[in-house]
Amino acid sequence: METIMAQNEILGKVAFATQYSHIKKDGKRETYIDAMTRVKQMHQEKFPNLWTQIEAIFQGFVFPGVVFPSQRSTQFGGIAIKRNNMRMYNCTASYVDRVRFFAEGFWLLMSGCGVGFSVQKHHVDKLPNLITKDQRDNRLNLVHVIEDSIEGWAEAIHVLTKSYLPSNEDEAKHCISFHYDQVRPEGASISIGGVAPGPKVLEVAIEKVRFILDQAVNQGQSRLKPIQCFDMFMHISHAALLSSRRAATIALFSPDDEEMMTAKTGTWWQDNPQRAYANISAQILLDGFENKSVFTDIIANARQYGEPGFFFCYDREFSTNPCGEIGLYPTFKDDQGNVSSGWAVCNLNEIVVAKVRDADHLLQACKAAAFLGTLQASYTNTGYLGETTKKIIERDALLGVSMTGIMSNPNMIFDEMTLKQCSKAVHDKNVEIAKLININPALR
């Protein structure tokens, strides 16, 4: 056991150095304490009235490695999160029910977030109609200059997709050409760390998305199919991956969608290698009318090809993050009853069980993790995503506290009374801190 723990600690240090540690002004990499200090100072600047409490949490639990803030806050804590609050969150979820999904999803991937998304038929059916072949072949050319930012890259995707899926006549008038000269060259440094991938990565994604759209138009389709939406976003995800960003994604689909059900069968890795960038799962409604044959088909495919998976729900509007451990509800209903879709987020902290001394120490670690998670939930400047997403995040203010290395002390972790006490401690601390910083307590 001690050997395994030592090996895990070494792997953890490697992961930290390669994925989370920044290069300092003196050219050296941050130590773990440096990185956590960066996160601590970010919270203290935002909440000066909680300066002492934040200091105590970091000194007592974070610096010793008992509690970890969200992975993304470790990676981007400081200026990067101040500029783009969505970098605080590990994962997100939404639906392909609006043209802006493709651009927003790209922006989130480039921000470091994982993306769960639904291509269920009832969501994809909400997209506008495709332009006709005659409309496409008789358009005026329009040059779009791509700005050198993640917003600029995302907007390029939006300009392209809305020209094929227009919501008005003006959007259908132009064939879009792209000007890439403002995009910094491959290898140039970027402000959040690392180097730029260069314009070719984006150009390839744009042209592959255009190919799918042109193919749909050439086939006389009036609407996109879920499999086409899936493939479009996978080409976009590949661009994020080649830009040294996360491309963690999961696609949820209708269980009667045969094309999605068989998306990873046959020689898909040769014909459609982009599909490797997402897990796919059928979303099965538990309403008492479940179709056993559909579930049998899923299992048969999974035994042969490893996918698809299945995602049980009581509401088809529920979604999940790529890890599949949390339900997310990315819609908002206003006072007039109008429903709009946006993005819901996963807000997760971690307790390292191997560093926990006893049940009382675990209880205190849970309170510390809940304290940090509640602070994290207050970062709701959603920027490119707009007001609907801001309202969803502020309404839910979700909080997750997970435990890693549970088998290092199973007697403590699997004790029912201890777990109930920990759950109550997380809830109570969340309510306390949410009131202090004037946000909603976690919806769940």
Tell where the protein language model's regions lie, with residue ranges.
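Extended catalytic cores of very large enzyme megasubunits
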Residues: M1-R444
